[in-house]
Structures are given as C-alpha cells and as structure tokens.
C-alpha cells in the first residue's frame, strides 16, 4: 500500500475519523510506540484532523440561523453566513 493510500481518509465519516484520531492520540501519549511508527501514525493523525476540519466546515455552511421579527418571534431562517 502506498503512503498516500495509507493517509487517504476521504471516505471516513466524521465519527469514524474522530474515533481513530482519539486512538492515535492515546497511543502517542502512552509513549510506547517506536519512533518510525510514531511518525507514521502522527502523519495519519494529521490527515484525520484535516478531514474532520473539512467535514465540520461543510456542516457549518449548511447550518441556518433563525431570523426573528421586531417582536422577537421566529420569522424564518437564513444561511449562517448571511448569504
């Protein structure tokens, strides 16, 4: 398996990526991993972190905020970023 294939996490769900990232952090914090393996799993962790950030950003763009009228009653929704 190529290095880029080992780092490919693009088809992971957010939950799967976070779970694997937590596992990697725990392994690195224990300190019982050889240097070469530590570097490899750190790189995988970076790929997982970036993937999670991408998924979170996409989710934020889909969230809408509730628009209130002058009386403070819900009037509708608008995109979070105001566009």
Swiss-Prot record:
Q: Which family does it belong to?
A: Belongs to the XseB family.
Its subunit composition reads:
Heterooligomer composed of large and small subunits.
From the UniProt record, list the reaction(s) this protein catalyses. Answer: Exonucleolytic cleavage in either 5'- to 3'- or 3'- to 5'-direction to yield nucleoside 5'-phosphates
Query: Which compartments does it reside in?
Result: Cytoplasm
Enzyme class per UniProt: hydrolase
* Role played: Bidirectionally degrades single-stranded DNA into large acid-insoluble oligonucleotides, which are then degraded further into small acid-soluble oligonucleotides.
* Molecular functions per Gene Ontology: exodeoxyribonuclease VII activity
Kindly give the SUPFAM superfamilies that the UniProt entry links to this protein: XseB-like
Does the record carry Cytoplasm as a key word?
A: yes
EC assignment: 3.1.11.6
Which keywords does the record carry?
Cytoplasm, Exonuclease, Hydrolase, Nuclease
Gene Ontology terms, cellular component aspect? cytosol; exodeoxyribonuclease VII complex
Name it: Exodeoxyribonuclease 7 small subunit
């Amino acid at each position: 398996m190529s290095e880029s294939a080992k780092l490919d996490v693009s088809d992971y769900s957010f939950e799967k990526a976070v779970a694997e990232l937590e596992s990697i952090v725990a392994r690195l914090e224990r300190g019982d991993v050889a240097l070469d393996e530590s570097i490899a799993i750190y790189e995988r962790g970076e790929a997982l972190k970036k993937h999670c950030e991408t998924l979170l950003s996409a989710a934020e763009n889909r969230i809408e905020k509730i628009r209130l009228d002058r009386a403070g009653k819900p009037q509708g929704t608008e995109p979070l970023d105001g566009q």
